[in-house]
């Protein structure tokens, strides 16, 4: 596990050193943009062909009627949602770098595909994280648009699919076992901080779980 973190750190350093000008950054963002689109197409194909609801990932009693959650090329819908939340802002940044207006408009419209995929992951944490990312982006780039965005979000709520709206309502619900499991994890983390705050317990879940 430690090798994974070291490799990730070295990769980050390599990217920081390699992306030395705007053109290199644009090519890198183009690659990320295509990766986001590819996974979105895979997720949409999963929805069209059918993906079974997994009781190990969703409390089916608290989320009755919710279809299976897409995960694209990932094994877990929450992990896929994390991927989208991290890369969608970068994919959007790529569209703003396109000089041709038609190309920029087309590339921006295609981002509707990964947005739809994010909805179909039914990842509540992913939805909340993406909403916060949009708010931060607008705050620094188009602060005057924030009131309009909030109004549009409120008006869009009745237009959401019923399963999505019901999923939103379960955020913070104590009747959802997955929420209770998170509370259990947080409590365990606080105990770990009290007992091993200075030394830690090592990398990875294989060290976290037994402690």
Question: Whereabouts are the PLM-identified features?
Answer:
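Alpha-helical transmembrane segments of multi-pass inner-membrane proteins
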Residues: 3-14, 26-67, 72-140, 147-160
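Aromatic-rich transmembrane-lumenal/periplasmic boundary elements in polytopic membrane proteins
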Residues: 41-56, 163-180, 195
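Long extracytoplasmic/lumenal interhelical loops at the membrane interface
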Residues: 53, 172-187, 191, 195, ...
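Short, hydrophobic secondary-structure boundary micro-motifs
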Residues: 57, 94, 148, 167, ...
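A glycine-rich, aromatic-flanked flexible loop/lid motif
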Residues: 158-163, 204-208
């Amino acid at each position: 596990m430690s090798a994974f973190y070291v490799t990730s750190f070295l990769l980050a350093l390599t990217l920081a050193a390699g992306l030395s000008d705007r053109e290199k950054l644009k090519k890198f963002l183009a690659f990320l943009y295509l990766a986001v689109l590819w996974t979105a197409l895979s997720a949409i194909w999963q929805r069209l062909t059918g993906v079974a609801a997994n009781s190990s990932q969703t409390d089916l009693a608290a989320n009755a009627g919710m279809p299976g959650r897409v995960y694209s090329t990932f094994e877990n819908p929450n992990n896929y949602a994390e991927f989208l939340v991290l890369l969608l802002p970068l994919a959007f940044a790529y569209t703003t770098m396109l000089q041709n207006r038609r190309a920029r408009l087309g590339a921006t419209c295609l981002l509707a595909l990964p947005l739809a995929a994010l909805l179909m992951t039914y990842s509540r944490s992913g939805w909340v994280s993406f909403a916060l990312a949009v708010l931060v982006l607008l705050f620094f780039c188009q602060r005057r648009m924030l009131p309009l965005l909030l109004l549009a979000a409120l008006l869009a709520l009745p237009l959401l699919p019923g399963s999505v709206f019901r999923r939103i309502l379960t955020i913070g619900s104590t009747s959802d076992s997955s929420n209770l499991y998170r509370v259990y994890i947080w409590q365990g983390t606080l105990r770990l901080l009290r007992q091993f705050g200075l030394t830690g317990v090592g990398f990875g879940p294989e060290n976290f779980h037994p402690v």
